[in-house]
Structure formats: structure tokens, C-alpha cells
């Protein structure tokens, strides 16, 4: 038999093995989904609260991916300015042999980071009084209130203040709907990341891989998968930072316990990527009772995502083998590769021109959070 015939047979065998593996993995996930409620009922209250928070974050990130909604983002930004910056970055790479592994998509991300921070979004320490237009010592907090019953803007909480100069109430609704944030163009880290991800997804297209990163100690950022660098890249739109996972522990001096990345197809514990100094690691058992239970339940949540992804494919394509192959290539293989490569941590070069300490938020606030760079 010719070598070409052998290659064909080996390729056919490999495809059969992949299909069989994908089918077993899918059936296992379906079975796990049926047991999830029973599994949850066995957790203690501490672990239940933690898991419910993860579910809430995961569900929030399933929204606002419809193409017609994403088009709204493109109408709200200065595309000409962004692409002018992208072209400049690409020219510098070619003329100065700068950043050889970065591709055009990476330059779009870099330029959006710069544009978003410096030209589009604004940080809010305290809301501005509608009458005197001031937002300093005249604005004093008076408590918080819950969201309205009809809540299209997805308000999580309303911070209430009073302007002592004008003697009027001032409110600061914490919006989560990125379409609303395209109007307000302001907020703190949650608003910044929600709006940035929405615009980034619109710019890069539906095939791009973008995920939301949640830290248990009250910070959020995001990542995208770079086809040029072939790995997940850290992005912090509040700070305008690209590929600096050491930022929080080694620059800010922030102590953290957990960091989770929420993607379309799976949730990943990325604590080891971002908690880069042992003295900045808060004991995870301060927030949960059992590390094993948390890991097992995250596996269950990932099974849910896998089943949902396959079900959505099956709605539009009836070829089972083709769907199973796609499931393997688009979900199982990527997830398994990241789990396997967690042991081989990539050393990311530190950018020395980043200022010390957190740059967003006033000095008193960043100091109270242990993010001012003074260890």
C-alpha cells in the first residue's frame, strides 16, 4: 500500500477516534447536568454563596452578543481614528521590526485600549451634581438603594449622594447593560470592562474569543485569544494595559484569592496566572469551605456550557459527525489544551514604563483597597 494510502487510513482512524471521544464527552456532560441540583444541595452555605456568584457572573456574560446590538457599538466610536492608529502601529512593526509576533488583530486591540481610555470612557469617583456640575467634597454619600423593578439598563445598585452646596440628591446607578454604557460613557471598573468587551467584540467579529475575568477581591478585567501570540492576552481597559498579568500583585501590591475567566464555552480558574507572588495569595479557604467541591462544580458548569454549545449547533446543522467534530475543535480541544498548559506558565515580559500603583480611582480609595503600589 502506498504511503498516501496509509496517511488516508491514519487520518480516517484519527477522525473516528475524535468523534468517539467527543460523543463520550457529550454524553458524560449530559449526565452530569442531570445531577447538578443534587450536587448543589450537598454544598454548605459558604460554598453555595460562592458558586451562585460564579453562576451570576457567567449568566451576565451570555448577554449582548446579537449582531444588531453589536452594530450599535460601531456607530458610537470613532472608527477612522482607531484604524488610523492601527495603520500607524502596523507601519512601525514593518519599518522598525517592532513586535514581530503581533498581527493586525492585535493592533486593533491595542489601539482600542488607548482610544477607550483616553478618548471614550470616563472614570467616576463620585457623581457630578446636576446643578453645580461639581463632584468633589460637596458630594457626600447617603446610602444605597436597589434597582427598579423594570430594569432594562441592568442596574445592579444605585449609589445615593447629596450635594451639600446645592442641597439636592445625586444618584449614581451602576449600569451593566453595555448599550446604556455607550450613552453614559462613564463608571468604575465594572462599567469599563462591560462596555470595552462589547466594543471589542463588535470590532473583532463573532469568531473572536473574548472573556471576562472576575477577581473575588472586587476587580474585573478581560482577556482575548491572540492568533498572533497564540495565547490568552490580559487586557485592563481601566489602566489601558495589554499583556501585563503581573500588574495586580507586583505593581499594585494587590492581595487576591481567586480569579476566574468566563468565556463562551468554559470557565477557567486563572488565579495562578494573576496571583504572581506568594505573599499576595489570600487563602482560598477564607471564601470557600472545600476547594474540591468548587472545582467539581465548575466542571459541572462547564459541562452545561458544552451541552448548550452542541445543542445550538444542532439547531442549524443536522450532520451529527460534523457537529461532534466542531465540538471537539471549538470547545473540547481548546479547553483541554489550556488545562494542560497551566503547568507550563508563560513568562510575560514586564513593561517598565507602567506607573507604580493603580491609576484609576482617587488616592484614598486605591490605598484602602491595597492597590496603590505601597506594599
What are these regions (language model features)?
Residues 201-217:
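Short, well-structured beta-strand/strand-turn elements
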Residues 117, 121, 200-205, 226:
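Hydrophobic/aromatic-lined pockets within catalytic cores
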Residues 1-191, 214, 229-375:
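Alpha-helical and coiled-coil interaction segments, frequently adjacent to or embedded
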Residues 197-201, 218-228:
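Catalytic nucleophile-His microenvironment captured as a short glycine-rich beta-strand/loop
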Residues 185-203:
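Short N-terminal edge-element motif at the start of the domain
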Residues 196-197, 208-211, 248:
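Generic recognition of flexible, low-complexity loop/linker segments
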Amino acid at each position: 500500500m502506498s504511503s498516501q494510502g496509509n496517511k488516508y487510513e491514519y487520518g480516517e482512524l484519527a477522525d473516528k477516534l475524535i468523534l468517539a471521544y467527543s460523543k463520550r464527552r457529550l454524553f458524560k456532560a449530559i449526565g452530569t447536568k442531570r445531577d447538578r441540583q443534587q450536587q448543589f444541595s450537598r454544598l454548605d452555605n459558604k460554598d453555595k454563596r460562592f458558586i451562585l456568584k460564579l453562576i451570576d457572573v457567567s449568566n451576565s456574560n451570555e448577554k449582548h452578543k446579537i449582531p444588531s446590538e453589536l452594530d450599535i457599538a460601531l456607530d458610537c466610536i470613532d472608527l477612522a481614528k482607531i484604524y488610523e492608529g492601527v495603520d500607524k502601529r502596523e507601519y512601525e512593526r514593518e519599518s522598525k521590526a517592532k513586535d514581530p509576533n503581533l498581527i493586525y488583530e492585535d493592533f486593533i486591540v491595542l489601539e482600542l485600549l488607548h482610544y477607550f481610555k483616553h478618548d471614550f470612557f470616563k472614570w467616576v469617583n463620585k457623581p457630578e451634581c446636576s446643578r453645580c456640575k461639581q463632584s468633589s467634597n460637596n458630594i457626600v454619600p447617603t446610602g444605597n438603594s436597589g434597582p427598579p423593578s423594570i430594569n432594562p439598563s441592568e442596574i445592579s445598585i444605585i449609589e445615593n449622594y447629596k450635594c451639600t452646596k446645592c442641597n439636592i440628591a445625586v444618584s449614581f446607578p451602576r449600569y451593566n447593560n453595555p448599550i446604556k454604557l455607550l450613552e453614559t460613557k462613564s463608571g468604575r471598573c465594572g462599567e469599563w470592562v462591560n462596555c470595552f468587551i462589547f466594543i471589542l467584540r463588535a470590532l473583532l467579529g463573532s469568531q473572536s474569543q473574548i472573556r471576562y475575568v472576575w477577581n473575588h477581591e472586587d476587580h474585573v478585567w478581560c482577556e482575548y485569544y491572540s492568533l498572533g501570540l497564540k495565547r490568552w492576552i490580559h487586557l485592563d481597559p481601566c489602566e489601558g494595559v495589554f499583556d501585563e498579568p503581573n500588574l495586580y500583585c507586583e505593581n499594585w501590591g494587590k492581595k487576591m484569592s481567586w480569579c476566574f475567566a468566563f468565556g463562551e464555552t468554559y470557565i477557567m480558574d486563572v488565579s495562578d496566572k494573576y496571583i504572581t507572588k506568594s505573599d499576595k495569595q489570600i487563602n482560598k479557604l477564607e471564601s470557600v469551605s472545600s476547594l474540591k467541591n468548587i472545582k467539581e462544580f465548575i466542571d459541572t458548569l462547564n459541562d452545561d456550557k458544552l451541552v448548550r454549545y452542541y445543542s445550538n449547533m444542532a439547531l442549524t446543522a443536522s450532520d451529527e459527525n460534523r457537529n461532534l467534530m466542531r465540538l471537539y475543535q471549538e470547545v473540547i480541544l481548546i479547553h483541554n489544551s489550556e488545562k494542560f498548559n497551566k503547568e507550563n506558565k508563560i513568562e510575560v515580559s514586564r513593561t517598565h514604563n507602567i506607573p507604580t500603583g493603580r491609576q484609576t480611582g482617587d488616592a484614598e480609595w486605591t490605598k484602602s483597597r491595597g492597590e496603590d503600589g505601597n506594599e
